[in-house]
Every structure is written in structure tokens, then in C-alpha cells.
Amino acid sequence: MAERQSASSPTPSSPPQQQQQTPQQPPQYLLNSKKNFKVKVLNGREVERHPLNSITKTEDTGKPKQSSLSSNASSLQSAAAAASSSTATTDIDPLNNNNNNNTDIDPLNNPLEKKHDPLSETIATMGGLKLIKENHLTNYVDENFMPWDTLKPSILQQYTSDDSNPIQVSFMSTGTSGKIKIPINRLNKILEELEQDKEDSKSTQFSQPDIIMDLETLHSELLKAWAAEERVRSLKIAIQTAKLLSDTSLIKFYPSKFVIATEILDTFGNLVYDRIKKRLQSSKESKNHEILLKEQAKETCRNWFYKIASIRELLPRLFVEISILKCYEFIQGDVNTEPKQVINRISEMIRGIGNPLVANYIRAYLTRRSFDLCPEYKKFVIQLLKDFVFTQKSYEKSKYLENTLSMYRITLTDYMGLYSPSLEWLLQCLAHKATPETLEEVLELFRESKNSLLLNHIISSFPPEYICSNSTMFSNFIKDADTLSYPKYQLYSTFGVNLVLGQPPKNQILSILNDVWKVVTNFENIKDYISVAEVFIEYVLTHCSEKETDVFLKDILRHIIPDKGYETIQSHLQSIVLKIFTHISDFGKLVSFTNFLPLLDLFNGESQKQISRSTLEALSTSKVMTSDPILINTFLTYGKALHDSLNSLSFQDEVRQVTQLVVNCINKIDFGRDVEKQLNFYVECRQTFINFDGVKNRLVYGVCEICEKTLNLVKGKHTPKTTSFIRACVAYCFITIPSIDDIFLKMNLYLVSSSVALQNQALSQADALLKAAITFIQEIPPILEFKQVKSTEDWTISYVSDFISLLVVTPGHPESGPFYLVKALYKVIKEYQWESSSTAKSKLFIQLLLLCSSWAQTSLPYHIEKVESNDQLFTEDPEFNTELTEFYNSLIKEILYDLNLLKDEPDNLTQKKVGIICIDLINALLNVGELNSKTASLIFNLYNMAKKIIPSTCFNEITYLKNTLAFIGTLESKMGQDIFNKLSQQQ
């Protein structure tokens, strides 16, 4: 104790006689009770877009978009560069060893000297049509055309023989890509097959991963062969790739195999075309040499086509020729080389392919590659479709279809679904910018065939406006279509998508719906029914009234409730509800639907969680406030379901999102002047969302708002009834706040609730809240360790300072006295585990000095209306003033004790903090204390300590010290001038 008293002396340089005091002497530091404060009075107060309209824009390079992939762009460039940089050493045709042509330049291997580009000036000299300009295809297609690259990922994802393993292809930039390690024995086998002279070698049946490995190898070897100027080997690789497309043993994988294999064929075709074109464009020689180059280009193309024509097997011959189809540009003028003639010839040759599935995919490949050559030419596509229909009819009459389904153990629906990608591409190319006559010709083809698969892709490919304007006709088409090639429910689903995207005639909207639903409502399979309903709910929401929407929901419930059929179609129901939320933003209007809430009650498990969240999102985005009991009950029901779906293992981000969602919903509930109902609602919310701190935080603030609203309603004069209500509100806060785990939320709520209780004259409850807040200060962690270590010292200082400001007007307890809360706070501050070298305790003790100064005044600087503070209760009491002075002196001693402990700390940061505390204490003493000899001596010593301890680099603190000295010089008292003169002499 003796050590403590010694340590609390002003400074080591204080005069000895000032430290030796007798118990009878009065305190040396006196409060000034005559400060002129300005008195203040505080008054209380998604249709998913149609699949053929989700368009990726064509690149603005002006060139037709090629199928070569970005991951191999550098490889292709290097291969082309190697091809164009080689030197001419032979006159032998690399594609025909028996060729005795006497030309000096090999059209395939011999590089051409750089010449002026003859194609850019006089392309007509090559005969026939002009070469397609680079921006021709770009100008032809628009946002309504879906590029092939957009279709590829969905094909690779959907068509696989092994659903558990996604297709991975290293050289593809679409879909799922990833490098695949190819076993060395597999690689050797493929390379050996390429070296065989016989072109009739057949590939052995392998698994899906094996086939992908084969294609990986073929692609890699193609690039290597081309870069090494091995043109014959490159052609053999293309042939080998095409042969793989004759195998349909893994029939479910065939569409994906087609996508991968044609990527390799595209690469081959582009390499051939780009090499010839680059050699022509790089030429800058004389006119005579320009003519020679044209002839060489023609000869090169002819040699490629002659060699391809010598392939005995029809399928690889067609695939490889189609891959270099664009090269016909260079030999226009020759016999039978006009593009349309070539395309027609190939389309007729496809009829020789025996497998209808393979034949249809080669039709799609022809359509795709010819689209680069002459996109406006569509007549041959109609003929291809006629061939498809004819083939289907032929095989339906024979045993082929039955045998195929039996061999591959596949259903008819699944088998016909394999044709979808090829048909979709055919019809898209045909329907894009097609004339009405072309569309009518396609429809006539359906009328003759009644093929439902064809009809499905007609509907999906034709413009939605065309479908809507002829909706009755298409509805009849669906009824007339056969049931073998494609399911009826999928036809109606595709039809519904177009009706949503377009605008049917107003006088036909209901008749179309009724006509369709007469058929759909009789579907026996609930999944077929709900698949159509999932699409047509958006049609009803878009084009029909709310009454029709409710009737439509009633029909859905009638189908799915018996035998608990809804349990197997949760995802479809969820999609229906989400579409309803998207189209009807007024949640109050939704709950007025007779059949909407019963639909929400059908969800369970994870679907219930998702739909509960969607329901709350719909409510939270409502633009109007509500007090509808049905809507509130809906909120509490689905809010509780969402609350109960989360636990301690849930991600904190998810908990925060749900909490904010619930808070947003609470903000939408307002009972106006009926504050009792508002409080009852908050009571229900607290019971429902007991685990959400953020919600409880909002509820406490909401109850405080109720108190303020009540105070305004009674104009500051509470009646016995409102007084009881206020007490109930404060009790709600007192009960709710301790249940919040977040200490920072908790502390703020205690402070706010205490203020509200004081404003509403609930003094005993305010006292209890303040006492609880003081107790919980000890639980504030000095350091937070979340993601990074962070000190809470600044927050704690700010909070306690606000708390002290409230204590200024808080009346003392009639039994415990005016100081019991202040002294309790003083004890908590003193015992709190502050960080080492912290001056926070001294800062707060200086705040308490200011509190003591306020209490020493005859009138406090501010008041709360209708609340008698300590200036009215205790100012005239001598015991109050004596105890106040003693407490004031004890605070100064504690501050000096801390300064003595910290002044010898070596680091500059602590030195700066100590210097600031010295200056703060000087200013506090000058402003609130009575300037006597004891105070003057303390100020003198504090100033010298600050001057000595503040580092020379701390310019702001040094300026603060100088300003403090200047302020002392403005004091009018003799004691103040003496201090100033004494300190000035030391400068």
C-alpha cells in the first residue's frame, strides 16, 4: 500500500512537502463548480431463354468462325509456319508417287516465294464464283443463330455411356477439358495402324475412355505430322479419325464422339485451307509469277481432292472431303466444282451410308462445313431432311429398328433422342433467315411424315413469332404426330417455350391453353404432366390473368396430391414456384391465391429449404409494408423452416445471408399505431429465430422504436397504460439481450435500451440495464482472432466513453447512492485485462474526471425531459460533494500511477501515448479543476514529462503540446500566468 501511495505521487520531481499529507487535510485537487456549461434538454423520441435464341456473338475479326480450338491455336500457327517456311527440294507429288508431272514446284510440300496477293485483285481469273469474303459469314449470322461451339458443351455433357465420369478432352476449349495420359501400348497400336498401307483396316471395339484416348492421340499426331511436312501421314490420320465414326457400338456416346472426331477433321481441313491461302497472300512477285501461283494453288487443291477420291470406303471419303470443302474456292471454274453442285453431290452420296444414325450426323457435318462456303444455300438441307424422313419410314417398316433397340438395349425414346443434335443443327441452319416458302416446305415435309422428332426440332428452330402466329396449327400438328419417334410431353414442352418467348394472338391465348390442356391433363405419367406444366405455368403468368393462374395451380394440385406424387417431382415444383415469384412481385397478391399456399406446403427436405428461402426473398423484396396475418403467418412458417435447416455445422456465410433475409422480411411488417400487435409480433419472431443473433439484434432495436413511437403518440406524457406497455418493452429487451452471443451487439443494445428506458421514465429498468452492461464489459475480448489479429481497444474506449456520457444524466439510486454505477464502472475499467503498454485505462479515467466535473455543477450540461438527474437530487448535499471530490482525487492518482509505470517504456509508440495522456490530463485539469498550488505543480510536472518523453518525430503531438502551453497563457488567473511564465522560461 505504501508503494502504491508513493507511485501515485505527481512525479518524482514533485516537492517532498507536497507528498506528505495528514489524513485530516482536505483533498489537494479540487473541482470547479462554477463552469459555465450551456444547458441542453434531451427530448425523448427465369423462362429460360429458348435454346436456339441463346446466342453467342460471332467474333468481330471479320473471318468465319472456325472450329479449331483455342488451346491449340499456337500449335496450329506453328504448324502452318513450318509448312510455309520449308524449302523446295523435290518435284514429286506427295499424294501420288506415280505422278510424273514436270512442274518445278511441288504443290503440297514446296513452299512458294512471297508474292503480291493475286486473290485480292483478280480472283475472277480463277473462274467461277468469287472467293467468299472474310466477313461474309459474320454478316450473314446474327444473334438468333447459335454457333456450333455453343452446342458442343451440352452434347458432351448429355451423351455419354458413363454418367459417373464426365468427358474430358485436352484439346477442346469447350465442355470439360483436362489432360489425359495415354498408355504407351495404346499409343503404339494407334501409330501402327496409321503406318498400315491397307485402308480397309477396322478399329477394334473399345470402351469410351479408350476411344477418347485414341482421338487424343490422333489429334496430337496430326499436329506433329503437319508441322513435319508429312502430308500423307496427316491425311491418313484424318481418314483414321473418320473411320472411328462408323462404329456405333457405344451408341449413347456416339453424338459426343462425333463432336470430338469432327474437331480433329476441322483441324485438318483448316490446316489445308490456311496453308494454301497464306502462301497466296504472302506472294509479292511479278504478274507472271502471280499467275503461276494461282495454277499451283489449283493443282494443290486438285491433288488433295484426287487423293481423297481414291479412298475406297465411303464414310471416311465423305468426312474427309467435307472437312476440306472450303478448298473448292481455289478451283472454281473446273468441271463440277461449283459449290452448290459439290454440296448436292455429297448430299446424294450420303444416301449410301447404311446406318441411319451415322448418316444423319454426316448430314449435319456437311451442313456445318457448307455453311462456311455458302450459308445462303438451303435447298440441299431440305433434301437432307427428306432423306432422314424417308430413312425413318423405311426402317420402321423393317426389323432394323427393333433389332437395333434389342442389340444396344436402349429404349425407342432414348434411341431417337440420339438424333436430336444433328437434327437441331440441320433445322437451325435451314430456319435462320429462311423465307416463308422454305418454312412452308419444311412443314409440308412433316405433314407427310408425321414424324414427332422432326416436329420437335421444327418448333425449337423456327422463330417464336412464327410459332405463336400459327399456334393453332402447331397444336394440331402435335396431336397428329406419331408417338414412336418422340414423346408427346416433350413436344408440348418445346411448344410452350416458344409461346412464352413470343406473343400469341390475344383472341387465341385461352383457346390455345385449353386446347393443349385437354391433352396434357389426361397424361397418366405424373412426370410427363408436370414437365409440361413447368413450361406452361410461365405461359399463364405471361399472357393470362391471375384468375387463370390460380385455376392452373388448382389443376396441378389435383394431379400431384393423390398418392403423394409430389414427392417424386420436387425439382419441377420448385421451378414452378420460382417462376411464380419471378412474375408476381407482390407477395400479398400471391397469398391471396387459393391454391398457392397449399402448393408451398408440398415441399420437404432440401427442396423445402430452397423454397422457404425463395419465399422469404419474395416477401423481402415487396415494395409495400404489410400487417396481413396470413402473410405474417407465411413468413413465420417458412422462416422457421429455414431457421431449423441450419445448425452449428452450417457455413457462417449462409447463416449471415439467411439472417439478413429474415431481417429484411421483419422490416416489411408494420402495424402502424397498433404498437401492442407490433410487440406481440416481435415476441413471436424471438421465439422463432432464437439462434440468429442478427435477428434478435433487429428485434431489440424494433422494440426500442416502439417505445419511441409510443412516447411520441402520448406527446411525452405517459398514461398508466402506456407506462405498463413501456415496462413490457424494456423487459423484452432485458430478457432478449443476454441471449445474444455476439458481445459487441450485446453491449450496444444495452446502451441503446438504457437510453430508451431513461427517456420513457423507466428508471429502475434503466438502472438494471446499465448494471448489466457494466458487468458484461469484462467479457469484451481485448483481441479478436478472425482471419487476422485485431485489437478491440479503440472500440472499447469509444463504447465506455458513450456509456459515461449517459451516466452524466442518469440519476443515482435512492438506496445505493449516486456513485454506485460510476464506481462499479471504475472498478471494471481498473480490473479489465488491457494490453501491455496500453494507455486506454488512463484515457477512460480522464473521461470519468470530466463526468465528475459535470456532476460538480449546479446544473448539468444536458438533461432528459421529465428525468431528475443528480444536479437536482444531490448537488446541495455536502456528503455528495465530499465523495465526489474524493473520487476525483482517486482518479488522478490512478492516472499518475499508470504514467509512472509506462514512462520508462523504451518503444516510441508507448512514449508517444504517455505524452498524449499527460497533455490530455493537463487540459482536463485546466478545464474542470480548480487551479490551486497542488494542481499547478501537477500541471508543471506533467508538461515537463510530456516534453521529455514525446519523440522528436511526432510533429502532431509536439504541436498539441505547444497549443496547450499557448492555452495556459490565455488564463487570466495569477496562478495560470505563473505556470505559463515558468514553463516558457524552459523553452
Swiss-Prot record:
It is found in: Endosome. InterPro entries: VPS35L. One of its GO terms (cellular component) is endosome. Residues 1-23, 66-111 have a biased composition (Low complexity). Keywords: Endosome, Protein transport, Transport. Residues 1-115 are annotated as: Disordered. This is VPS35 endosomal protein sorting factor-like. GO terms for biological process: endocytic recycling; protein transport. Belongs to the VPS35L family. Acts as a component of the retriever complex. The retriever complex is a heterotrimeric complex related to retromer cargo-selective complex (CSC) and essential for retromer-independent retrieval and recycling of numerous cargos. PANTHER family: ESOPHAGEAL CANCER ASSOCIATED PROTEIN, VPS35 ENDOSOMAL PROTEIN-SORTING FACTOR-LIKE. Residues 43-63 have a biased composition (Basic and acidic residues). Component of the heterotrimeric retriever complex.
